[in-house]
Amino acid sequence: MQSGLYVVGTPIGNLADMSPRAIEVLQNVDLIAAEDTRVFGKLAAHFDIKTRRVSCHEHNERDVVPDLIEKLQNGMTVAVVSDAGMPGVSDPGFRLVRAAREVGVPVYVVPGPVAAISGLVLSGFPTDRFTFCGFLDEKKLRDDNKIPHTIIYYESPNRIMNTIAAMARIMPERKIAIVREITKIHEETIIGYPAELMTITPPRGELVVVVAPRPEHKMSDAEISEIVNDIAATSMKSAAADLAMRAGISKKEAYKRLLEKGGEND
């Protein structure tokens, strides 16, 4: 086995997705850096992985990474794993990989499942261009809506209904897919416009939210008027920018529409 750092993907729900190569690597490296040694312990027991392990997570990386780099420079083989999926994808791991690269330590990847990509594929939305934004931040949703192509988020079941409501306000014209419990027994994909999904039973489990690209066609006058009513209470400058972005019209046209609306209210 070549010395270096091995970035190993692990199942995101179905243990049958563990690759033979991943098992072989984890059984034969000198040390495993796990996000949570207790969580990994269950996987290790199932696949008879007895390799020594240490914790390496977002709260201790600054202390642990230098020690791991020293071990790697001394010729040891180290594998890094997260609780599920690929390390470094909204999980610890990228700092260790970056540090290894900086000192010339070889880095190898043992690919595994990624919830974000699985959710994207299940959504049926375009995959030629997409942006993964990690865990959804509602405060950044308005800026995210400027992204014209497919967007992928991770989200908590405790916040998903508030998120759907926010999307109904900010990006009502974009379809969304809520994909839950990927590769597990209760895997489910729910697709619709945000307003249509506001009455669904709150989905449980691990969630991926995929947002379809912004519509290329311009909205109808009736649809634009509905948006105007929604944002008329905001300042003229921000309202015009919001209307232009959401309706696919120029800012000049947006100002005109808002002024017309103001005249109707006088």
Question: What annotation goes with each model-predicted range?
Answer:
Residues 95-147:
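Class I SAM-dependent methyltransferase SAM-binding "motif I" and its flanking Rossmann-like core
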Residues 1-58:
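Glycine-rich, flexible N-terminal cofactor/catalytic loop recognition
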Residues 26-32, 104-107, 150-151:
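Short active-site oxyanion
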Residues 56-62, 136-137:
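Conserved helicase motor
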Residues 38-40, 86, 115, 159:
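Alpha-helix capping/helix-boundary segments
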Residues 34, 109-112, 153, 178:
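General beta-strand structural signal in soluble alpha/beta enzymes
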Residues 74-85, 89-92:
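Ordered, amphipathic secondary-structure segments that act as subunit-interaction surfaces
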Residues 2, 76, 150, 154-266:
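A contiguous loop/helix-start segment that scaffolds small-molecule binding in enzyme catalytic cores
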